[in-house]
């Protein structure tokens, strides 16, 4: 909990809900009480709405991961909270939490870690990010993307992630466009020559069409296109 406060994942204004029971029945009761508290507060029409942070210890989380009834309470509770902290958990439990959320929701999950104990979690998520640092390169080598420091995550997602999505989309659409353009002209020419098999282009022209004639626009768009500046993307995260 102290680390959550120090990294500002949990703020002083949040109400912290702690689940640290050892028995499955006690864990179920604690989760249900916390969920009732969060839902009751959300139902009250007052502003500003109180924010919650959920803290779950490893032995309680173990019951959640192996009991679907507990998972049915845990996930709605986690969705009502601004932050969820799982403490004193094993590397396997980290991966199982990701698998649980992945199985029960349609959201895209991102996992980030900096050590060997985060490898399973990183590989279980849709997108894995490894931080190369003092704890070695195991996480960075097993991840989809590697960064040097945690603070680079903001620019990686809001700027480079946004640009990459737009570049890939435009490149794919352009590839379809240039291919359709070529073969539609051949189709219309076939109507003109009564489908005799005569081609409208020389064989070398058709070979060079994708390799030379239409290659540069795809490369330029796929590498250099910036439909919005980096400063604007960081200033307005809603664009992400």
Model segments located where?
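N-terminal phosphate-binding loop and flanking beta/alpha elements of the actin-like ATPase fold
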Residues: 1
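Membrane-embedded transport module
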Residues: 5-110, 115, 119, 123-240
């Amino acid at each position: 909990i102290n680390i959550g406060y120090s990294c500002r994942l949990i703020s002083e204004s949040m109400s912290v809900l702690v689940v640290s029971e050892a028995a499955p029945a006690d864990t179920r009761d604690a989760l249900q009480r916390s969920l009732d508290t969060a839902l009751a507060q959300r139902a009250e029409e007052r502003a500003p709405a109180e924010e919650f942070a959920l803290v779950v210890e490893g032995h309680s989380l173990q019951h959640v991961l192996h009991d679907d009834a507990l998972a049915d309470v845990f996930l709605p509770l986690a969705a009502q909270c601004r932050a969820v902290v799982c403490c004193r958990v094993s590397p396997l439990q980290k991966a199982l939490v990701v698998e649980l959320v992945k199985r029960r929701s349609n959201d895209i999950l991102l996992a980030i870690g900096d050590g060997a104990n985060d490898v399973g979690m990183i590989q279980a998520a849709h997108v894995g990010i490894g931080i190369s640092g003092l704890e070695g390169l195991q996480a960075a080598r097993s991840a989809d993307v590697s960064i040097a420091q945690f603070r680079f995550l903001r620019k990686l997602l809001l700027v480079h992630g946004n640009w990459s999505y737009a570049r890939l989309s435009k490149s794919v659409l352009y590839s379809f466009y240039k291919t359709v353009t070529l073969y539609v002209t051949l189709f219309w020419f076939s109507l003109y020559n009564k489908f005799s098999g005569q081609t409208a282009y020389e064989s070398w022209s058709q070979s060079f069409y994708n390799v030379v004639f239409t290659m540069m626009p795809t490369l330029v768009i796929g590498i250099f296109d910036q439909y919005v500046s980096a400063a604007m993307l960081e200033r307005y995260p809603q664009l992400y």
